[in-house]
């Protein structure tokens, strides 16, 4: 059952509460200097980093923001839940801001992520520091707001990272999963806080590292889009293919950001496997004319300032 009865504006927690939580999350990462580290803790942190990146790249980004593939309502909720566990708020909130980013990308101050119109600090993280940015305008994502479970999860997204934090501590403290008992603090610091903060920074880097920076030895600009985006092959693995950002801005509805075989897009590879299993389907391809355009390209400089 879906509904259209949701109020147009979903209020978030207070800005003060958000700031306090953000400070705590980042300060907690300093715990790496005070807790023991086992190989199991480290590899679990690495694995959860990639799970978190996949959750927002495949879920919040390609599915909820751009509808680049289809899936069941059950798996849709699983994607939304995983995205909440990444610490990037609810998927409706994520999609409304990202759709606005594409609408005004690097051509208007309304693109809150653009380093062309705002400071690097504002484009990277500072844009979050207002009550307006934290609230969710459900009218900007009516296709998602018709699902009451997504609206609920969007409002109470913080409950799930909190539950994961508690579970992580209990597993580390009272079981030998990480190599010994008594590793609750280590597990929390590394597999929860460090893993989550790094995955968040990877998302923020798409705004400040791949917008408005001239092409260089690891950045290239295949398409002459109106925005100032580039691709960054060096970040392909850490961001699971999301770093082919100029490609994405040329055709944002595709299920893949690495348009060619040599552009490693691990998110798309996972989606392809899931499509073979019929968990997802109707992956939107890159149109042939766009592929041909890219093959003929010899690279482009950034557009002039608007």
Where are the regions a protein language model picked out?
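Pore-loop/selectivity-filter region of tetrameric P-loop cation channels
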Residues: 53, 88, 131, 236-247
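Non-catalytic, topology-defining segments of multipass membrane proteins
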Residues: 1-205, 209, 253-306
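Active-site-proximal inter-transmembrane loops
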Residues: 143-150, 216-244, 251
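Intrinsically disordered, low-complexity coil segments
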Residues: 174-186, 212-230
């Amino acid at each position: 059952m879906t509904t259209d009865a949701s109020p147009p504006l979903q209020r978030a927690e207070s800005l003060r509460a958000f700031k306090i939580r953000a400070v705590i999350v980042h300060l907690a990462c300093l715990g790496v200097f005070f807790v023991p580290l086992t190989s199991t803790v480290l590899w679990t942190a690495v694995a959860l980093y990639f799970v978190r990146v996949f959750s927002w790249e495949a879920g919040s980004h390609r599915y909820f923001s751009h509808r680049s593939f289809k899936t069941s309502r059950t798996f849709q909720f699983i994607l939304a839940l995983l995205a909440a566990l990444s610490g990037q708020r609810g998927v409706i909130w994520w999609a409304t801001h990202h759709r606005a980013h594409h609408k005004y990308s690097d051509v208007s101050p309304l693109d809150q992520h653009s380093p062309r119109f705002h400071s690097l600090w504002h484009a990277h993280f500072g844009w979050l520091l207002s009550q307006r940015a934290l609230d969710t305008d459900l009218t900007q994502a009516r296709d998602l707001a018709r699902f009451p479970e997504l609206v609920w999860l969007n409002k109470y997204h913080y409950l799930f990272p909190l539950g994961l934090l508690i579970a992580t501590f209990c597993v580390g403290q009272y079981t030998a999963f990480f190599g010994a008992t008594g590793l609750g603090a280590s597990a929390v610091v590394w597999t929860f806080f460090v893993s989550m903060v790094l995955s968040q920074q990877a998302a923020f880097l798409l705004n400040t590292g791949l917008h408005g920076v001239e092409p260089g030895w690891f950045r290239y600009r295949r398409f002459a889009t109106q925005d100032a985006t580039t691709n960054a092959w060096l970040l392909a693995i850490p961001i699971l293919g999301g770093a082919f950002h100029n490609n994405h801005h040329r055709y944002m509805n595709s299920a893949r950001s690495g348009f060619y075989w040599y552009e490693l897009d691990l998110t798309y590879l996972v989606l392809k496997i899931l499509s073979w299993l019929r968990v997802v389907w109707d992956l939107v391809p890159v149109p042939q004319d766009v592929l041909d355009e890219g093959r003929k390209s010899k690279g482009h400089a950034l557009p002039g300032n608007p």
